[in-house]
């Protein structure tokens, strides 16, 4: 049963909402420059905190894995990425939130932030309209960063690959280790895959996926590691492309195109990685699944 929060407390449009790992907290962000934290219990919800610090619309919020603590990242039109942490205080006062890191090296809107799989550490990728991607990492009690050019006309989205290689779980041969890799979508209509080189400690493009004829608004890497790699990309050209790569030929990516009646804003995989949710400018959400023949079929429409 869906729970609807009708009175969000925000004074303007809400751009993103995200639940924590346990599904007990909900963070929302808005053009009113604030972030709201709700506590969820059964069918009820309670506003427990309003976080203020951004100087522009807040586009994105993302919870870190709980093994790093109660940490939330936010990104804004103001060009900043803020890292927030909840700290327990005296029993009588409960807990309090504080800003633990400000990252302000981007020169334009930061459109999306995405945490890496927790196996890779406390690592955050940030996509900006200045054409750059930054990667922040918390190690040894301090934050470090890398920033590099990614797309000529701006970066709209970023999504991490699973830490394990596809097929490694069911393979008879041992895995070669964890992979640090992500995908970006840009205003240059391109989807790019970035690989980390542990020797040079830098990221470089390993694949450029072409096919969209409009801005790529969102990308999402499937969390499934059972067989193949799947990346979904959503575009202003009214299509979603599902890019597939097989472990037997990891350098080849093929795509399947889904067509829609409106601009497509967001794509999101289920936790198991086998169902794709698509939302667009027509205020509809549809769910898609691959059949046994390798074709993608719509299994449900969700309309308010």
From Swiss-Prot:
Q: Report any one BP term from Gene Ontology.
A: mRNA transport
Q: Which Gene3D superfamilies match?
A: YVTN repeat-like/Quinoprotein amine dehydrogenase
Show the PROSITE patterns listed in the entry: WD_REPEATS_2, WD_REPEATS_REGION
Where it sits in the cell: the answer is:
Cytoplasmic vesicle, COPII-coated vesicle membrane; Endoplasmic reticulum membrane; Nucleus, Nuclear pore complex
Q: What are the GO cellular component annotations?
A: COPII vesicle coat; endoplasmic reticulum membrane; nuclear pore outer ring
Topology relative to the membrane, per the entry? Answer: Peripheral membrane protein
Q: Does the keyword Membrane apply?
A: yes
SUPFAM superfamilies to which the protein is assigned, alphabetical: WD40 repeat-like
A molecular function (GO) held by this record is: structural molecule activity
**WD repeat start and end residues:** 9-48, 53-94, 105-146, 150-204, 211-253, 259-298
Record keywords? Cytoplasmic vesicle, Endoplasmic reticulum, ER-Golgi transport, Membrane, mRNA transport, Nuclear pore complex, Nucleus, Protein transport, Repeat, Translocation, Transport, WD repeat
Respond yes or no to whether keyword Endoplasmic reticulum is given for this record: yes
Q: Where is it chiefly localized? A: membrane
Q: Which InterPro entries does this entry report, sorted A to Z?
A: G-protein_beta_WD-40_rep (IPR020472), Sec13/Seh1_fam (IPR037363), WD40/YVTN_repeat-like_dom_sf (IPR015943), WD40_repeat_dom_sf (IPR036322), WD40_rpt (IPR001680)
Q: Which family does it belong to?
A: Belongs to the WD repeat SEC13 family.
Subunit description:
The COPII coat is composed of at least 5 proteins: the SEC23/24 complex, the SEC13/31 complex, and the protein SAR1. Component of the nuclear pore complex (NPC). NPC constitutes the exclusive means of nucleocytoplasmic transport. NPCs allow the passive diffusion of ions and small molecules and the active, nuclear transport receptor-mediated bidirectional transport of macromolecules such as proteins, RNAs, ribonucleoparticles (RNPs), and ribosomal subunits across the nuclear envelope. Due to its 8-fold rotational symmetry, all subunits are present with 8 copies or multiples thereof.
Query: What does the UniProt function comment say about this protein?
Result: Component of the coat protein complex II (COPII) which promotes the formation of transport vesicles from the endoplasmic reticulum (ER). The coat has two main functions, the physical deformation of the endoplasmic reticulum membrane into vesicles and the selection of cargo molecules. It also functions as a component of the nuclear pore complex (NPC). NPC components, collectively referred to as nucleoporins (NUPs), can play the role of both NPC structural components and of docking or interaction partners for transiently associated nuclear transport factors.
State what protein this is by name: Protein transport protein SEC13
């Amino acid at each position: 049963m869906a729970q609807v929060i009708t009175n969000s407390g925000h004074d303007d449009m809400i751009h993103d909402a995200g639940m924590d790992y346990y599904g007990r907290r909900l963070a929302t962000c808005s053009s009113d420059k604030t972030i709201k934290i709700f506590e969820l219990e059964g069918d009820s919800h309670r506003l427990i905190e309003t976080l203020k610090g951004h100087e522009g619309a807040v586009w994105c919020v993302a919870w870190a894995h709980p093994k790093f603590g109660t940490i939330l990242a936010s990104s804004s039109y103001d060009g900043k990425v803020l890292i927030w942490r909840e700290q327990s205080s005296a029993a009588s006062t409960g807990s309090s939130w504080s800003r633990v890191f400000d990252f302000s090296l981007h020169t334009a809107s930061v459109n999306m932030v995405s945490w890496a799989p927790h196996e890779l550490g406390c690592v955050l990728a940030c996509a900006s309209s200045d054409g750059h991607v930054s990667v922040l990492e918390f190690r040894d009690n301090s934050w470090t960063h890398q920033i590099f050019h990614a797309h000529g006309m701006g970066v709209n989205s970023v999504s991490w690959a699973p830490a394990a290689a596809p097929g490694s779980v069911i393979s008879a041969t041992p895995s070669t280790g964890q992979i640090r890799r992500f995908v970006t979508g840009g205003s240059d209509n391109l989807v790019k895959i970035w690989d980390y080189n542990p020797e040079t400690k830098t990221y470089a493009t390993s694949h450029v996926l072409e096919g969209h004829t409009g801005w790529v608004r969102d990308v999402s890497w499937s969390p499934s590691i059972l067989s193949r790699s799947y990346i979904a990309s959503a575009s202003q050209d009214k299509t979603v492309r599902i890019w597939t790569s097989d472990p037997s030929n990891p350098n080849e990516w093929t795509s399947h195109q889904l067509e829609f009646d409106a601009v497509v804003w967001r794509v999101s995989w289920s936790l198991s990685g086998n169902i794709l949710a698509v939302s667009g400018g027509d205020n509809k959400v549809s769910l898609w699944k691959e059949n046994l023949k390798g074709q993608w079929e719509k299994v449900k429409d969700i309309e308010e």
